Curated annotation (Swiss-Prot):
Free-text function comment from the UniProt entry: Protein S12 is involved in the translation initiation step.
Record lineage: Eukaryota, Viridiplantae, Streptophyta, Embryophyta, Tracheophyta
Cysteine-cysteine disulfides: none
GO terms, biological process: translation
Keywords from the named record: Mitochondrion, Ribonucleoprotein, Ribosomal protein
Record-level Gene Ontology MF annotations: structural constituent of ribosome
Protein name: Small ribosomal subunit protein uS12m
Chief subcellular location: mitochondrion
Amino acid sequence: MPTFNQLIRHGREEKRRTDRTRALDQCPQKQGVCLRVLTITPKKPNSALRKIAKVRLTNRHDIFAYIPGEGHNSQEHSIVLVRGGRVKDLPGVKFHCIRGVKDLLGIPDRRRGRSKYGAEKPKSK
């Protein structure tokens, strides 16, 4: 433990916070090109085939991004917009693709949570 004089001379060193989404370069979103679209299985208590895409961002970073929602039209060479946000049961997947922007279509006929999946407002009768 430092003495009072040592604290006056040097002060305390602030802890550096690690950046969890370094690939985005402090931007809210980044555009990228899909290199591969694949399915992986989640961690232990869960069971599914989760859809992810390997994306090369405009700053040349290669990342894995989760494709949310049921069904998608994404394939190799599709242009997608990527935001931060990890998927808790998929290790190494720290980004989400944004639906309804660029080549990744929104989900048709979705009524609830439409803004998260790029869905159009349903026509009222």
